[in-house]
Amino acid sequence: MPKMFERRVYLLALAALALVYFHNTIPHLTMMPRVNVDEPWLMERAYQVMRTGIPTQPMLGLKTAYLLQVGYGYLLAPWMAAFGVGLFQARLFNVLLGLGAVLLVSSIGRRTVSPTAGLAAAALLAMDSNFLGGARNARTDMPSVFFVAAALAAYVVGLQRERGWWFGLSGACLGLAMLVHGNAFWAGVILLAWYLLDYGVAGIVRPRGYNWLAAGWLATFGPYLAVVVARWQDVHVQIGNFAGDRVPAWRPSVILHQAALEIDRYRGWYFGLVTKSVPNPLLWTFRSLTAIGIVLLAVRIAIGPSRTAPDRNGAARLLILAAGAALIFAGFINNKVPVYMPHLLIGFALAGGFAVSEISALLPGFAWLGPAFVAFYAIAGVAYYEKWYSSAGKSELVPYESTDATLRLLAPSGPKYVYASPQFWTTFYGDADTDFLSYAEAQPVDGGGEHPVTLAGATSGRPIVLLVDELQWLPELAAGISQPTTSWQKDWVSFIESHCVLEAEALGTAHGTIAAYSCVLDGRPQPTSGVRIVGGATEFTVVRPVLSQTADDLARWTKYDDPRRPSTARPSVALTADGVRISGDGWPGILKMFDATPGDRYLVRTQDSMTHDGDLLYLGTWQQPQVRSLSGASSSGIPAPLIAQRWFPRERAFIADAPQVRMLVYSEAPSTDFVISSLDVLRLQPAPARTARAAVGR
């Protein structure tokens, strides 16, 4: 009876943690994190599997099967077939797999240490920002983590029940984990170490479970191996194109170099649901318990297992898992991004859970400390993420459904080619007369003389629309973040300047300004009478100017005195023949309180030059709600970069929420030197329905 009672309490506590996990993962699911470029790539491959059975990548011009990380597409395809194609559906799929990983980790903790250890490990995962970010993102990481956790849990069950098919299930899950993401090979090393721990070398000479493990792994991963061997040339090319820098090296010098860089991954541990470095007591607790748990595991190994331990090798098993995974990732996982942290968090959470269980067991009469910690930690997690939701809700982020409505206003209906950031694939995938291509797929090639431009994927028979967003494609064109040479950027910019006209601009989206260009391959399209202005799902027209500031007027604005400015800073604001020159360090700038009508919408235009990264027009303030974006977000203010590219829209817009709105022109750069010569504010109003597609004069 006591055991039955304990099991029911354990299951009730686990159900409560599952509810807490859903609280941390379901709200604002399509709003935060912002759509990652990997998500639509993976969704498109799954969509192609659903349609044709082959994981092709049309947006990147890949007409044959993408042969790397093929498992995710085949996992997601039936889910899409059942529930539809969309960002919410894809992210919900990973949320459920993340819950599965939490439950499996709890099972491992319960079967190797104690129910308290299992619940504490589950709580640490369910409250971790990095793990939650992976669960809320439609990437391959969380499905791989789920199958890794399943492989480890199945092994533990097979060991305790002495049933070979559990080992077979463990091997099959390992194969699935590796099909989804190649990084999961680390779990195979851990399982081998566990097997040697339990059976020794003799266990390989006299098979017990490893033959089942191998058979299960070959059942799921074997067919893929056969395809790799048969199509090695294609696989080799795709590795070179997409993952050449991520292949593990085997030279000791390279391994040591990679290990020295591993600290970069841990610096980004916080990144996930919480997307910026802010005080995070949950993370501090997790880190502390992990460190304490590693030490206590070593101590427990030295003094021997406790009398009540369900697994005599439990401490050694968890230490191998936590430390072994960390060592493998340090030396052999070259990409040091924090999105791979959930793999490591399996072992870290179990080490932390062991610490909670061990400490509560070592204190006579305080066995309640373990369950109390789990309850308190869960409540603290709910409160913390409620606060984060509130804070992030004041940012520029909006649900993707809002972005979808904006994109449909920007792009004309009918047959067309759309070149844009991969994030926008979800909007256009179902349009039969639209060919959506990632900007990275093509490079305009000037035919010279009378020959038209060649643009991969496009012909002169249909309109060409470019959707250049401020946060992804524009930085690529300005700085070449992912392209190895400047020719790609120069050719795209030249194409935009010579063969395109700006047809519409969406202001205040979750992706900054999105500019819609109408382009042709030969010559230049006819200029429009104006540019349409879009905010959210509404088009706007300019009514009249309400404020016009020349350089002389700007020179009379109040000089900005930033509270962070050190006494050694040398900010400068001076009126010159070209305008007001803002230079120096210490956040130099000028500000003015603009008299606004709450609820009205305004467009802000600046004339500036020599601007660089960090030079901003800040509308509103974070201290009090004064503005919102045209999409209804950014209630904590709109810190808008002063765009240097002349071919890209430079206006900003806002909805006034207060009778006075602060307008601040300044720089966050370590040092700056730019000129602003004028600033104009114009009132906007929704365009009448009959002229909703009419252009707005500039």
Positions of the model-derived regions?
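Extracytosolic helix-loop segments that constitute the early lumenal/periplasmic catalytic or substrate-binding loops
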Residues: 22-28, 40-74, 78, 249
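Transmembrane-lumen/periplasm boundary regions of multi-pass, lipid-linked membrane glycan transferases
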Residues: 42, 48, 176, 188-305, ...
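Hydrophobic/aromatic-rich transmembrane helices and adjacent perimembrane loops
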Residues: 134-135, 141-144, 177, 186, ...
